[in-house]
């Protein structure tokens, strides 16, 4: 029997094994070698017989038989004629499957250009020929001739000639004196005659000579393509095709529908057009038709081939019968519906089902309820096998009948089959890895899947009609992985932040909170209980309540495992919770002897997990859930309208604020403040009022009241219980119900000045209702838009990080990042402990006073160490980071630190990149889906003061302080910092003070925690004088540079600087305020410059000419923008902007060196700012700043490297160039974290660091050394290291480069793997580039392996790959030894050697 047939029944035949995939341009010979025959006719199938036409697009002679082992005319049927070619119809007798793999070809009568190389920008053909794309197209589409060989004529090579010019030239020089051609033949000749080596040499020489940047870029582009061709072995003329391949017919099917019509793939239409035009052209050439007709036909052939390869790339889109554009070969690959994303990366699988989910509170954590009907269908093959094994059926048919009849024995067998066979549950959208978990199925009646309540958080599921899908892992390995890695009991911690995710929520929290409440004066107060039995008895007989204050004995074990018992002041309810705690010395009763809010419950579960291990935690979680549900039910907590308390003080607060607002209106009418300032103040006043009302309301709701008759404490307010416990609702929602609704935002994000004074209990007026709908509607619209954006962000993140895998244990690097606590507005938002937990220490950490060792270098910082470090008051710690890891591919385990989802050091082969991407992307969607919960209620708090966050002594760095005429201390320095030192002189905090701030402390003062250090006006920025004297104006011309606005209602004027460059007359002005001394001369500043203060647009003057001013007085104020509400809507685009490394619109200008400011000569409408360097041997740096921009520095100010010359958001590229990688990392991490923090989402820094690492993979060459690189090349970091190693070995000069920051999209498209890049975006461009360079994909990342259908090189797949690699090299060595004839004896010790060296063995 034939081998192929044997293989059918023996699937264990290994697939072809390959290590890499190469892509290159196909030469005409190559295309012919693939082909099984030429297609000569455009016919497809015969419409009567449905048989394919001979030599047509479906020809059976070329592509193979339609039915297995049967030729077309029916002469040979059956297996026995296999391989025979029928002499009548010419069809080979074989499997019809070959119609999916055999290709054909079309011989073109005239060459045509491949549209990818022509039109995919930058055009490869035109770059190579050094012509413009327009010119190349003119030649290709038969508009102009091109001179290929000028001979001795006056014509130039590559000169374009129109028809008339060509005729004139022929008349003038004669036809044989020069060669001019037209069409693809011309381009073919030019490409074929190129001497690539010579061109490359010329280009390099020219590059060395040229100085212009633009020219350099152009030459480099061309040189790159020339070198690509030389290295890959492709020939340039292959970009012009003489033969077109035809893909196998079963990949472009033609299916007869009923009613005599056909459904066909668009490709058949496109191929038909090509064949028709090609045949017509052949006929015209044979007939010797006039040149113009032939030329037209050639142009049409070129267009039809273009449409076949990439429809719509050039000219009109070719449409089918129904005006729909035809799908070309490129469209088959591109986009979400293309081959890559639809069929290779995402496949539909069998053995799956989906149904609605309902809650299953009586399940264990590792179980799910599976409907019987569903299980019967999903496990059918297993049931058939078991029925056969037990002798109930002898054939599959019989088994099928038994199952269909649902005989009782079938149900018994189903029970056996399902036992301990895990199934996977998945809820779409799967935003992180916890969206798919494994459970053991329990058969249930009905048609709904039952889900354990505790895993709802991970799936983000609720029971309002959500559906979930079930998948059955079939092979033993798959079942093993499902059980060991994916079981819900193995996913207790959240991979994003390491906190427990199996945490009770809603009812369970409420029940536990109710249990743990302690009330005064309850019956039985002060009783003592010796054990839990007595307690239960007392509760049953109602001698005590759950909330009575009692003394109870709690029994547990100490740290050595010895049992002990201790008496606590507690309540019966808390003892009931304590009863469930696992017995462990590290888990004391104190963790549940408190009010059990959601936070405390989470901490409790975390403690249990860290000290008692997984099994105990799972059992504990299940019990605590049962307890919570039971008591939530028994407590019977509900709420009515009277639970929403409206505070009595509300009316007074509102009245006071209304008076205040009236006062502001009056001030505005009197011209004391501007419209913008009034707006800010009013918004601020209402914001404060809302807060006050909320505080009053909370105080009322929280208040403990006692019953006069019984003296017992009244039950707590239900709404307060729900909110405070964390079960449902937030103080914000309570405020809207019982306080006042507050300020609302317009859809544009601005805040409406009039707030909503009513709350929902009182009801809104029509006006208020209308205003509130604004915000609510914006919320809903945002939600819809943001979900898509967030999904796209996640996709880009996954794509950039997918090949970041833990590949080694330790890279041994000496570099890392410095971690400090993050302080925002005087509040510590992220403590140093939280940031370093689970990271590896880079240096030894010693106690600053006693000097004793806390953590050794290279060891992980664990929970006890964090406590020690925070006690010791250490401010900054150097840690290892994935960002500075020196492993070439992937990262090492030590740099990454703790695997957050397991709480142990990260395992080899963990796909940390994907986990990072999911951790950052998942909350993006969560948040955006939740925007409307705030109903657009505005929250404006502009910080306007500094508070001491520690106790200690003040020290002021770069001190520059004056006392103004009011006797206040004023900060005059641009980069002053107030530091607080503790009694040991260790710096505890350091905060920048804004210019113009009023200081409450000075050097050497002692401060208490929470004391005000400084304050400033958050709405304007002052300009102050540091010398006393008389004011004089310069260039402040009415109507040109300053506008005197008289307020009509008040008649008071104020002066505001306007944009003076808008008129030609004003273009030379430099508006300024000058201070003159007593003798009438311009006063001198302490630094030696003149006291001349330049003004920016929109500045409001605070002085008149002739005003006497003293030091520290304000001359003018620049208003800052009005406050906008913060909402993740601003957040998500912000995160995307940071990851894409886009330059912000008005980005800050950052000083590159330390030095003093000097103002140079202005340039057009820009101001020239020069920094004179502080140290010698450094060139001064100059910046041009648009004149209207608020520029706050004065001549002579000292500025440090990294300070802002012009305010704004800094461009990440500048931070990288000026301050280096570490500063960039901390900037990106902090900015991204800020967005998430605002929404209360905790993400560990290391995830963001992993992504930033992927963005810093490229290096720009600054010095090429002896390498083949050119200065300005963007090279892979790893590649550069390899090249340099080789250069140094040969004693040559290595190349140097600076790190380049790429946005995530760019970084994804520039991965070494072209398969991964092509499946991401811009498929045609990526494949074109890869083909020209003849790229090889080494299948390193996850995506490319999924696409070619192998196990991913991470996790269990990675281990298999390692083992396979060792085995292969071992076999090679043994064969090598055999060849040498020394036998295999020597190979064994070498083998052990290799196994030790292999990374897997680590």
UniProtKB/Swiss-Prot annotation:
Role this protein plays: DNA-dependent RNA polymerase catalyzes the transcription of DNA into RNA using the four ribonucleoside triphosphates as substrates.
SMART domains: RPOLA_N (SM00663)
HAMAP family given in the database record: RNApol_bact_RpoC (MF_01322)
GO biological process, one term: DNA-templated transcription
Name used for this protein in its record: DNA-directed RNA polymerase subunit beta'
Originating species: Rhizobium johnstonii (strain DSM 114642 / LMG 32736 / 3841) (Rhizobium leguminosarum bv. viciae)
Listed CDD domains: RNAP_beta'_C, RNAP_beta'_N
Cofactor binding summary note: Binds 1 Mg(2+) ion per subunit.
């Amino acid at each position: 029997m034939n081998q192929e047939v044997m293989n059918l029944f023996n699937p264990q035949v290994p697939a072809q094994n390959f290590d890499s995939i190469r892509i290159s341009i196909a030469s005409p010979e190559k295309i012919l070698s693939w082909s099984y025959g030429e297609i000569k006719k455009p016919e497809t199938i015969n419409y009567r017989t449905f048989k394919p036409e001979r030599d047509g697009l479906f020809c059976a002679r070329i592509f193979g038989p339609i039915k297995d082992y049967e030729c077309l005319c029916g002469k040979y049927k059956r297996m026995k004629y296999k391989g025979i070619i029928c002499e009548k119809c010419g069809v080979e007798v074989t499997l019809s499957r070959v119609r999916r793999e055999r290709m054909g070809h079309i011989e073109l009568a005239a060459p045509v250009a491949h549209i990818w190389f022509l039109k995919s920008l930058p055009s490869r053909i035109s770059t190579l020929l050094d012509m413009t794309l327009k010119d190349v197209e003119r030649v290709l589409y038969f508009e102009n001739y091109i001179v290929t060989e000028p001979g001795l004529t006056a014509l130039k090579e590559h000169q374009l000639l129109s028809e008339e010019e060509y005729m004139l030239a022929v008349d003038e020089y004669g036809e044989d004196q020069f060669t001019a051609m037209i069409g693809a033949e011309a381009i073919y000749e030019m490409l074929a005659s190129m001497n690539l080596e010579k061109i490359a040499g010329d280009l390099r020489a020219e590059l060395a000579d040229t100085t212009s940047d633009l020219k350099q870029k152009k030459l480099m582009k061309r040189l790159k393509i020339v070198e690509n061709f030389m290295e890959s072995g492709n020939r340039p003329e292959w970009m012009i095709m003489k033969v077109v391949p035809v893909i196998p017919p079963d990949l472009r099917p033609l299916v007869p529908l009923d009613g005599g019509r056909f459904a066909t793939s668009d490709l058949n239409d496109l191929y038909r057009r090509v064949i028709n035009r090609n045949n017509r052209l052949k006929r015209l050439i044979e007939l010797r038709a006039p040149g113009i007709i032939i030329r037209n036909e050639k142009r049409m052939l070129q267009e039809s081939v273009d449409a076949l390869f990439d429809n719509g790339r050039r000219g009109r889109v070719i449409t089918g019968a129904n005006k729909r554009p035809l799908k070309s070969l490129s469209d088959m690959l591109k986009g979400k519906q293309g081959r890559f994303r639809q069929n290779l990366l995402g496949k539909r699988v069998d053995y799956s089902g989906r149904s609605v989910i309902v809650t299953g509170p009586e399940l264990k954590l590792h179980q799910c309820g599976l409907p019987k009907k569903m299980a019967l269908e999903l496990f059918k093959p297993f049931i058939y096998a078991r029925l056969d094994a037990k002798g109930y059926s002898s054939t599959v048919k019989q088994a099928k009948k038994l199952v269909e009849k649902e005989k009782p024995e079938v149900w018994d067998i189903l029970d056996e089959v399902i036992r301990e066979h895990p199934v996977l549950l998945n809820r779409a959208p799967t935003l992180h890895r916890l969206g798919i978990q494994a459970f053991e199925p329990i058969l249930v009646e009905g048609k709904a899947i039952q889900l354990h309540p505790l895993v709802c958080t991970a799936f983000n599921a609720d029971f309002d009609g959500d559906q979930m899908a079930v998948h059955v892992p079939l092979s033993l390995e798959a079942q093993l992985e499902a059980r060991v890695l994916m079981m819900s009991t193995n996913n207790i911690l959240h991979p994003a932040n390491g906190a427990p995710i199996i945490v009770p929520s809603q009812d369970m929290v409420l029940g536990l909170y109710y249990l743990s409440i302690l009330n005064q004066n309850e019956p039985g107060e002060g009783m003592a209980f010796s054990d839990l039995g007595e307690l239960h008895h007392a509760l049953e007989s109602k001698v005590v309540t759950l909330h009575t204050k009692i003394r109870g004995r709690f029994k547990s074990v100490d740290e050595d495992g010895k049992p002990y018992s201790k008496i606590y002041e507690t309540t019966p309810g808390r003892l009931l919770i304590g009863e469930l705690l696992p017995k462990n010395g590290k888990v004391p009763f104190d963790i549940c002897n408190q009010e059990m809010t959601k936070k405390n419950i989470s901490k409790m579960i975390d403690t249990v997990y860290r000290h008692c291990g997984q099994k105990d935690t799972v059992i504990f979680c299940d019990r605590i859930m049962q307890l919570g549900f039971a008591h939530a039910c028994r407590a019977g907590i509900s709420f009515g309208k009277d639970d929403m308390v409206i505070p009595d003080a509300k009316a007074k607060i509102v009245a006071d604020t209304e008076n205040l607002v009236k006062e502001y209106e009056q001030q505005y009418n009197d011209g004391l403040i501007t419209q913008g300032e009034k707006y800010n103040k009013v918004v601020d006043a209402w914001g404060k009022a809302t807060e006050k009302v909320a505080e009053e309301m909370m105080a009322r709701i929280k208040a403990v009241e006692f019953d006069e008759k019984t003296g017992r404490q009244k039950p707590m307010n239900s709404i307060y219980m729900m909110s405070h416990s964390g079960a449902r609702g937030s103080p914000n929602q309570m405020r809207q119900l019982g306080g006042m609704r507050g300020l609302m935002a317009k859809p544009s994000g601005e805040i409406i000045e009039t707030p909503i004074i009513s709350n929902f209990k009182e009801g809104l007026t029509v006006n208020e209702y209308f205003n509130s709908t604004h915000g609510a509607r914006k919320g809903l619209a945002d939600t819809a838009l943001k979900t898509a954006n967030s999904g796209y962000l996640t996709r880009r993140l996954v794509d950039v990080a997918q090949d970041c895998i833990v590949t080694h244990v330790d890279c041994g690097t000496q570099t890392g990042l410095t971690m400090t606590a993050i302080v925002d507005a005087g509040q510590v938002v992220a403590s140093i402990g939280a940031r370093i937990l689970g990271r590896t220490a880079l240096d030894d950490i010693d106690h600053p006073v006693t000097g004793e060792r806390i953590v050794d270098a290279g060891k992980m910082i664990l929970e006890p160490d964090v406590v020690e470090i925070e006690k010791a008051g250490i401010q900054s710690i150097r840690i290892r980071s994935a960002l500075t890891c020196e492993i070439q591919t992937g990262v090492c385990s030590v740099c990454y630190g703790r695997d957050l989802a397991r709480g142990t050091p990260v395992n080899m082969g963990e796909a940390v990149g994907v986990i990072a991407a999911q951790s950052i992307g998942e909350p993006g969607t969560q948040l955006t889906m939740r925007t409307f919960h705030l109903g657009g209620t505005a929250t404006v708090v502009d910080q306007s003061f500094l508070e001491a966050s520690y106790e200690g002594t003040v020290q002021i760095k770069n001190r520059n302080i004056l006392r103004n005429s009011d006797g206040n201390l004023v900060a005059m320095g641009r980069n002053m910092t107030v530091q607080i030192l503790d009694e040991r002189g260790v710096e505890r905090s350091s905060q920048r003070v804004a210019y113009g701030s009023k200081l409450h402390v000075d050097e050497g003062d002692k401060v208490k925690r929470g004391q005000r250090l400084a304050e400033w006006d958050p709405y304007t920025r002052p300009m102050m004088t540091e010398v006393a004297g008389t004011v004089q104006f310069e260039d402040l011309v009415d109507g040109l540079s300053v506008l005197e606005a008289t307020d009509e209602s008040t008649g008071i004027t104020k002066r505001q600087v306007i944009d003076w460059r808008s008129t030609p007359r004003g273009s030379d002005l430099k508006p300024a305020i000058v201070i003159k001394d007593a003798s009438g001369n311009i006063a001198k500043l302490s630094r030696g410059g003149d006291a001349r203060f330049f003004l920016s647009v929109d500045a409001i003057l605070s002085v008149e000419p002739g005003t006497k001013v003293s030091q520290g007085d304000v001359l003018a104020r620049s208003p800052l923008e009005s406050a906008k509400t913060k909402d993740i809507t601003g957040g998500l685009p912000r995160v995307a902007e940071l990851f894409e490394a886009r330059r912000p619109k008005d980005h800050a200008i950052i000083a590159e060196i330390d030095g003093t400011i000097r103002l140079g000569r202005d340039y057009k409408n820009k101001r020239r700012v020069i920094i004179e360097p502080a140290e010698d041997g450094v060139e001064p740096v100059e910046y041009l700043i648009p004149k209207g921009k608020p520029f706050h520095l004065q001549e002579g100010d000292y500025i440090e490297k990294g300070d802002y010359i012009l305010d704004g958001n800094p461009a990440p590229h500048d931070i990288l160039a000026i301050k280096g990688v570490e500063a960039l990392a901390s900037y990106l991490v902090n900015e991204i974290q800020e967005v998430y923090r605002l929404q209360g989402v905790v993400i560990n820094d290391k995830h963001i660091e992993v992504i930033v690492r992927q963005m810093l993979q490229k290096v720009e060459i600054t010095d090429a050394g002896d390498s083949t690189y050119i200065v300005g090349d963007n090279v892979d970091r790893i590649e550069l290291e390899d090249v340099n190693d080789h250069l140094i070995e040969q004693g040559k000069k290595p190349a140097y480069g600076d790190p380049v920051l790429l946005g995530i999209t760019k970084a994804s498209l520039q991965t070494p793997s072209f398969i991964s890049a092509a499946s991401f975006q811009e498929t045609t461009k990526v494949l074109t580039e890869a083909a020209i360079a003849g790229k090889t994909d080494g299948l390193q990342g996850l995506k490319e392996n999924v696409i070619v259908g192998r196990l991913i090189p991470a996790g269990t797949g990675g281990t298999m790959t390692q083992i396979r690699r060792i085995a292969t090299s071992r076999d090679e060595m043994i064969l090598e030894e055999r060849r040498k004839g020394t036998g295999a004896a020597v190979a064994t010790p070498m083998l052990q050697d290799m196994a030790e060296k292999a990374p897997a063995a680590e």
